[in-house]
Amino acid sequence: MSIQHFRVALIPFFAAFCLPVFAHPETLVKVKDAEDQLGARVGYIELDLNSGKILESFRPEERFPMMSTFKVLLCGAVLSRVDAGQEQLGRRIHHSQNDLVEYSPVTEKHLTDGMTVRELCSAAITMSDNTAANLLLTTIGGPKELTAFLHNMGDHVTRLDRWEPELNEAIPNDERDTTMPAAMATTLRKLLTGELLTLASRQQLIDWMEADKVAGPLLRSALPAGWFIADKSGAGERGSRGIIAALGPDGKPSRIVVIYTTGSQATMDERNRQIAEIGASLIKHW
């Protein structure tokens, strides 16, 4: 068993023998400050990975655009099909120029040879490749089937209605392609620690998230040496930004953190900075 596999297998073991975790209100002060700085709603939740206990939250049951954070849920659905013998990670899918949508840095390089399901999930999560996400959505039956998968998990809040890139439109009061921080955190926890996926599939999902290459300016920028993080960011119209993550000290995840914001006129750099500062406060008062 590799060190990574050992780590994920023992997540419940380590957490079960930790002392109770108590959150600190200082982080919520920073979340509220971020709202003021961005002139936008910010949703935040911090969940204990083992128990599922909510440690802190702000607007946990308000809807926010999912943006590209949905890609983790999508690959969870794909892995569920793999576990059921309905899909193979090594199956190669061919695509054409007509399939390409904006921001497809990986799939645009494979028009001649195609990509395996494993490679598409890696591209969707680590590089946020939009065409990869659409191709994977096709394999499960489209956005409505992802929503059905989530419903079967017990998540009756999170919904995907459209494809990339339209799902990032983020129209105010539009419930399409949205989630709530509490629902997303609970669903992510189930995917990473529950019995829905096999151990191998849970490991694969967290490996893809750990290898995320496009979330550097967010929580990762505030992470001390030796800390673990597996995450997925998202960006959308109308100042929307978000991140979902499993993180913790000593090289292993112990909490789920979800942050969403929408409705800001701030630049992308400023949105990134505010989320990074929330992360810095979280870590300081861990």
How would you describe each model-predicted region?
Residues M1-I11:
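Bacterial N-terminal signal peptides that target proteins for export
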Residues A9-P20:
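Bacterial N-terminal signal peptides
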Residues H24-D36, L55, T138-T139, P143-K144, ...:
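Structured C-terminal helix/loop/strand segments within mature extracytoplasmic catalytic/sensor domains
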Residues E35-F64:
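Short, conserved catalytic-motif segment at the N-terminal edge
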Residues R41, T116, N134-T193:
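Mid-domain, small-residue-enriched loop/turn segments at the edges of structured enzyme/sensor domains
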Residues G52, F64-I93, V257:
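Active-site SXXK
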Residues A84-K109:
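Short, glycine/proline-biased beta-turn/loop segments that scaffold the active-site neighborhood
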Residues L100-L135, P143:
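Conserved catalytic neighborhood of penicillin-recognizing serine enzymes
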